[in-house]
Amino acid sequence: MRSHYCGDVNKSHVGQEVTLVGWVNRSRDLGGVVFLDLRDREGLVQVVYDPDLPEVFNVASTLRAEFCVQVKGVVRARPDSQVNAQMKTGEIEVLGKELTIINSSEPLPLSLDNYQNNSEEQRLKYRYLDLRRPEMAQRLMFRAKVTSAVRRFLDSNGFLDIETPILTKATPEGARDYLVPSRTYKGQFFALPQSPQLFKQLLMMSGFDRYYQIVKCFRDEDLRADRQPEFTQIDIETSFMTSEQVMAKTEEMMRGLFLEMLNVDLGEFPRMTYNEAMRRFGSDKPDLRNPLELVDVADLLKNVEFAVFSGPANDEEGRVAALRIPGGASLSRKQIDDYTKFVGIYGAKGLAWMKLNDLTQGLEGIQSPVLKFLNEGIVNEIISRTGAQTGDIILFGADNAIVVAESMGALRLKAGEDFNLLEGQWRPLWVVDFPMFEKINGSFHAVHHPFTAPRGVTPQELEANPANRVSDAYDMVLNGCELGGGSVRIHNQEMQSAVFRILGITDEEAKEKFGFLLEALRYGTPPHAGLAFGLDRIIMLMTGASSIRDVMAFPKTTTAACPLTNAPGFANPQQLAELGISVVKAAKTED
């Protein structure tokens, strides 16, 4: 039905007859000539109909926005005065000779031109219309090109695209599973995979030493701007490769991807340990475009007569950190109060501050409600450590070390945005040497997942002192977002059993949930390592979208619902009976 895409017609086609199909973006009658902007996924082209062909002209006069039409005509150059430099096809137009209305359109329930006026609910309910917007179409086309480039790279490096099951077994991987009831085995359930983790490890044990898959994953978790109940991973696993080799290969892939798609050279990725990232930036995925850093000052404050500082300073699990904001002395008291409320979201009890109005006047040039508790030597050392100057403000977080990291790390990001301090467009890095475990409410939990290998210890040494062990894990971070995370996997049954015991998984529970894995580890398992990238997040960053919902064709809302199809929905009683399921209705509460 077409000879060219609308957005592909250019000056090289002048004089040629073309057949185009698409949607009417805009139609206007100017002085007896109908101008039609025809749109398809590749862009817009202007079509002109004049009264010399009355039958066609009359049809053109009836066109309205979003009619689906076929156009036949001859390409001609626009006069210089009418060239539109803002359009890809702005040097030409098509003189229409024939016109077929394939389908008319009713008035749209949402605006495609002023989409900002559409609610998120509207955009998702009428997603098939929202996707007609050039911005949305370009993002999905960009996504397709990225996945094609990823496949090319991995194929050319000997990786095999192998599918793994979608109906599988529930395993504890950190989030709730989506469960699928079995009709054949009443009362039993499949789970949709949170990742192909165990199957890709089993593929390594099967001898397929380089695997990849662009795969759907499912997690029933509380949603945020960068989370969806179903999302896509670039999943990679290798045998007989060290963590350094996996990092080098996947960094090569990511650098090549940015160069091909955006003409951006990311350069060599720096390395940073987890401890350094948390100490300097309060985050294990630091945004290095932001020059602000947290500075430890607890050692200076152990003996001050101000319990807010001295308490955490003398607590092994406490921390006092200073954050210098250049030019921050201009902050009003209300703005400081707003920052105090902001850190309160992360559990901080308050925010101390020190304005450096004029350092030439010594302490007289400093304004702070805590200044009376600090001698001149302490103040000068804080100023020296933070590199603060006249006109700056120093903000202090004092609390449990975790609270300080989370609250001051978040404040660092907010202040960087508020004061326009971000430097450069792309700042990648690797974060390495993660703790093997973290303690939550007295119990150990895996920082990555239970199949991550510790670095340089025996199973006995790991169980004897799990709190201080480092994992052979690595995260790729870009502009404060985790692009992907991976690790060397445990390939020894004794080590895997030790990790399960540390996590409070009994031998019986391990056998019930992971018996197939423990069995497989007995039969010559090779050393293996891998990594999984969040494809949606990568596309979001590369296109500048504000949410992964804007780079997915049919995403869910933040409450994990689909307004387009009204999913999830109720099952009919017959289906439930076949599955052996009865629904317990919530009791009504009286007003």
UniProtKB/Swiss-Prot annotation:
Keywords: Aminoacyl-tRNA synthetase, ATP-binding, Cytoplasm, Ligase, Nucleotide-binding, Protein biosynthesis. Its EC number is 6.1.1.12. Its main location: cytoplasm. InterPro entries: Aa-tRNA-synt_II, aa-tRNA-synth_II, aa-tRNA-synth_II/BPL/LPL, Asp-tRNA-ligase_1, Asp-tRNA-ligase_1_N, Asp/Asn-tRNA-synth_IIb, AspRS_core, GAD-like_sf. SUPFAM superfamilies: Class II aaRS and biotin synthetases (SSF55681), GAD domain-like (SSF55261), Nucleic acid-binding proteins (SSF50249). ATP binds at R219, D220, E221, Q228, E482, G534, L535, D536, R537. It is found in: Cytoplasm. One of its GO terms (cellular component) is cytoplasm. NCBIfam families: aspS_bact, PRK00476.1. Belongs to the class-II aminoacyl-tRNA synthetase family. Type 1 subfamily. This is Aspartate--tRNA ligase. It comes from Shewanella sp. (strain MR-7).
